[in-house]
Amino acid sequence: GLMPEEDYDLAGFAVGVVDKKDMITGENLKPGDVLIGMASTGVHSNGFSLVRKVFEKELNKEGLETYYEELGTTLGEALLAPTRIYVKALKAVKNAGVTVKACSHITGGGFYENVPRMLKDGVRAVIKKDSYQIPPIFGMLAKKGDIEEHMMYNTYNMGIGMVVAVDAADAERAMEAMKSA
């Protein structure tokens, strides 16, 4: 439909170029390589149809400005936390001399659809869910919407916005580079 005259919709995108020699293809990925997850800032830009359904009653000025102790902020601030951009961290890893063998931006389809895309045949991922903190917005969504864990991981990034694979010998150096970025 048409938007009211006083409303607006804002969208943006970026286009990049990469030399073929610098492409991250996953072809050198092997069993024993290490996956490193980079923290997300929250929901990012996916799963908002479900967010709207779950928080239907709160999607007004009063509801969005309500402070929630478990979030440490208002619902509106938690839902609209800017999407983290990972280019600085990836550049820092490259500048540290670490080869990123494969990577996956955890967007639509969540963990369960995106991580397998970075893997080549014969390689599987083992994710230790207790190795990182899940931002509280996801717990609130799951509880309020009565959403099963599998569906949450199939829809949202669950606190990890990007996953990279590196050689086990390079894992510590890669993580230090990411922290410094």
PLM regions: where:
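Acidic, glycine-rich loop-and-beta core segments that form the ion-binding/anion-interacting portion
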Residues: L29-E77
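Residue-level recognition of conserved structural "scaffold" positions that shape functional pockets
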Residues: M23, S49, V54, V115-R117, ...
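Glycine-rich beta-alpha junction loops
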Residues: G16-V18, D33-L35, A39-H44, R52-F55, ...
